[in-house]
Amino acid sequence: MKWNEELDAQSDHPLVPGVIVVLDLDKFKEYVRERGLDPYRPNIVTGELTEAVEELARRYRGVVVYGFSRERGTEEAIIEIPYLEDVNSLVKYLEEVSERIKSYGASISIVVLRDFITGKPARNRREAYYATPARRRAIKLLKEIKRKGGGRILVLT
C-alpha cells in the first residue's frame, strides 16, 4: 500500500498533493473588547480578512474548508489549494494580508504547509481541524506560533 493510499483510508475523501493555509487573528477577543466592538458582527479587521480569504480562494483556486463568514466576519480560516506547486506568490499575498491586518492594530498567525489534502469543505470544526494528518499538523503548528506570541507566517514546503 502506497503512503497516500494509507492516508486515503483514514479520510472520507481521497487525498491529493497541495497546500493547506491556516490563519487566525491573534488575541482577537481582547482586540474586540478593548475597542468596544460587537463580536457577532463584521468589523474592519474581520471584514478585511473575509475579503482576503475570498480573494485567496479565487486567485489560487482554493477551497475554503472552514471559517469563512460574511455574516460575522472571518476570524480564522482553513483553505486548501489542490496541486499548487509554487507557493512564492501565495506567501507574498499572505504577507500583504498580514500587513493590512497590522495596519488596523491587530495581528495574524498563518501556517502554509505542503501536504496531502482533500480540497473539500468540512462539515464542522472538528472535521476541519482533525480530519486529515495535514490539518492536524497545520493546527498544531498554528498553536505553537500563537503560544510564542503570534504575528508570524510559517511556511513548510
Regions found by a protein language model. Give the residues of each.
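Regulatory and interdomain segments flanking nucleotide-handling catalytic cores
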Residues: 1-157
